[in-house]
Structures are given as structure tokens and as C-alpha cells.
């Protein structure tokens, strides 16, 4: 199942998919997120969340290790070459109850310690190099190619030299927590007529859909939302 589509014509798009199960009133809506996009994408997602009854949202607790791992996209905001913003959705403004089954600061710290000192040092070296390269020479087209690779289940392209260690910390361990939360919601509320939104990075959606499928949920509706166009708009004042 495709969650992020990259084409010349439509740019980068995210597939918002609704799942339901026969005999159950509960519906899940998955929102595959990209952490760097046009403001309109995040505004559209935020607006849609108002119609939900419960949200399942990602968000690793703040920690030095977490900041190091997320620096690759955080420091690309403000780049005039990309003209994109970091994901921001004000859940308190949305006003819908939400849960955050993600890594705690202590869990990130423990996972970071399991990675060798050599690899940790390389991360701190390579992420800034990647950021500088993207700010100086990067384009939306380059970023789109990276997102097409991430669609296959990889983590941040700046960390691709260390797939095993970092996949476990930033992907698989978080997937397990997310899947556990989905199972709990199904078990406790499957007979309620509610709409549950799952707002997580697109790389986590393979685990989400696999869990929903095993529980008997099937897609019943889907639509594309544009994350960003490949070619940014040109200002007539330039």
C-alpha cells in the first residue's frame, strides 16, 4: 500500500486512508505525515482533525539524543531554496482528546546508549553535513527523491549508513508502541461509533496498516493531500 506518492505532475502527496471493520462502528483514519512541507498541508490536516473523537499522535520526548536525530529536517526550515516549514499542528487548538504512545526521554536515552560511540559520533558529524548540503544545493526535487526512498521503510536519509541501529531506535521500537496503542483502542472501543485519527510519520504506516489488517479493518475511503509541489512557486517580485 502506497502512503507517499512522488510525481512530476502532482508533486509529493500523502494518502489519507479510512479503515473500518465489519460489525464494528469504530473507524481509523491514517494520516501519513512528512515532517517538512508546505504550510497548507499541515493546515488541511489540522482542520480535518476537528471531526475526530480521538487522536493518536507521534512525538518523541525532548532529549539531547532526540534533538540530534531530528536535526536533519528541523534545520532545513527557513531555507529559501526549499521554502518549506517544519510540521506544526496545534493539538490544543484542535480540542480533540489525544494519546501519545511514543518514546519517553529515558527510552530515547537508553536506545541512544545501545548505539556504538563511533556511530553516535558519525551521526553528529553527518547530519550537519547533510543539512549544509541541502541548504546550499538542495531542491524540492532532491527532497522528494529522499521521500520516495523513505516510502520503502527507511529512516531519515541522513542516517542511511546505519540502518540497523537507528531503525531499531527510531522506527521499530516506536512501531511496537504505536501498534500496542491501536490494539488497545480496538479492544476497548470497537463497538463505539467514533473516528480515530492516527497522525504519524509515513514510515510508521506500514506497521499501522499491518496491525489494522490483522484486526480485520479494511480501507473504505482514501484521498490524496498535497505535501508540496516539486517546483516551488516563483515570486514575480524576484
PLM-predicted stretches and their roles:
Residues 1-173, 184, 221-232:
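Structured, acidic catalytic/metal-binding patches in enzyme active sites
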Residues 34, 202-203:
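Active-site metal-binding loops of divalent metal-dependent hydrolases
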Residues 173-190:
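A short, acidic, amphipathic alpha-helical segment used as a generic capping/interface helix at domain edges
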Residues 195-200:
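Beta-strand elements within well-structured catalytic alpha/beta cores of enzymes
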Residues 205, 209, 213, 218-238:
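Short, flexible loop segments at boundaries between secondary-structure elements
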Amino acid at each position: 500500500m502506497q502512503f507517499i506518492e512522488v510525481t512530476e505532475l502532482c508533486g509529493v502527496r500523502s494518502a489519507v486512508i479510512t479503515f473500518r471493520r465489519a460489525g464494528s462502528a469504530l473507524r481509523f483514519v491514517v494520516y501519513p505525515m512528512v515532517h517538512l512541507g508546505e504550510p497548507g498541508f499541515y493546515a488541511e490536516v489540522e482542520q480535518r482533525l476537528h471531526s475526530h473523537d480521538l487522536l493518536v499522535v507521534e512525538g518523541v520526548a525532548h532529549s539531547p539524543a532526540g534533538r540530534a536525530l531530528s536535526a536533519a529536517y528541523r534545520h532545513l526550515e527557513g531555507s529559501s531554496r526549499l521554502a518549506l516549514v517544519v510540521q506544526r499542528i496545534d493539538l490544543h487548538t484542535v480540542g480533540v482528546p489525544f494519546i501519545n504512545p511514543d518514546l519517553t526521554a529515558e527510552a530515547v536515552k537508553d536506545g541512544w546508549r545501545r548505539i556504538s560511540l563511533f556511530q553516535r559520533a558519525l551521526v553528529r558529524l553527518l547530519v550537519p553535513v547533510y543539512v549544509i548540503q541541502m541548504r546550499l544545493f538542495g531542491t524540492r526535487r532532491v527532497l522528494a527523491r529522499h521521500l520516495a526512498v523513505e516510502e520503502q521503510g527507511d529512516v531519515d536519509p541522513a542516517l542511511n549508513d546505519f540502518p540497523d541501529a537507528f531503525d531499531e531506535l527510531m522506527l521499530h521500537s516506536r512501531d511496537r508502541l504505536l501498534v500496542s496503542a491501536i490494539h488497545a483502542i480496538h479492544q476497548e472501543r470497537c463497538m463505539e461509533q467514533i473516528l480515530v485519527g492516527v497522525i504519524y510519520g509515513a514510515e510508521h504506516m506500514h506497521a499501522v496498516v499491518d496491525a489494522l489488517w490483522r484486526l480485520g479493518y479494511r480501507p473504505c475511503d482514501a484521498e490524496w493531500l498535497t505535501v508540496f509541489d516539486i517546483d516551488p512557486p516563483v515570486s514575480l517580485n524576484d
